[in-house]
Amino acid sequence: KIFLAIIVIWGIAYLAMFPGIYDYDSIDQTLQFLVTGNVSGHHPVLHSLLLSGFMKIGYVVFHSYEIGLGIFTLLQVLFLAYAAMKVAWFLLQKGYNRLFWFTMCFYLCFPLHYIMSVWDTKDSIFAGFFVLVSLSLIEMADRTSGFWDNRWNLVKFVFVLGGADTKK
């Protein structure tokens, strides 16, 4: 229900700003892969590859870079909504009911959240991974014994830590 509430509100922003906010960094990032072929480390290579890759898929399949950008943006919206849901769910599990409702209102009503969810910049994805790394660290501190016994916890932590490397 938490995820659905976020998706409904942010989905309106996605539809209003389809295929997403394509900013100056995104232009430079996609030029590296789609036009020049000269890839530099000025922007995170993985983010540049994902953004360009989805745009190329959109062009190949639908004859539209915009559709590819829209698919990338949709996946980004879903990922950021998942990260926001994890924060809200964490607060609810810990019994912070008032803080949960405040957080939900903040995620749903503060425009910057849904604008950043459709903004195709590396900062948006970095923010989502930063939230997930922070939640993982809190979970480690809460469960000092037994956290590392579960290999799935290690896999999740390495994944979110690696994903947080989308920012220089």
PLM region descriptions:
Residues 1, 92-94, 138-155:
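Membrane-interface junctions at the ends of membrane-embedded or membrane-associated helices
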Residues 1-22:
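Transmembrane signal-anchor helices characteristic of membrane glycosylation enzymes that use polyprenol
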Residues 17-31, 38-54, 62-67:
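Extracytoplasmic catalytic/substrate-binding loops of multi-pass membrane glycan-assembly enzymes
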Residues 34, 86, 126-145:
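Specific aromatic-rich, kink-prone transmembrane helix
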Residues 74-94:
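Transmembrane-helix motifs of polytopic, lipid-linked glycan transferases
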Residues 100-111, 164:
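Short helix- or helix-capping micro-motifs
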Residues 151-168:
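Membrane-interface alpha helices of multi-pass inner-membrane proteins
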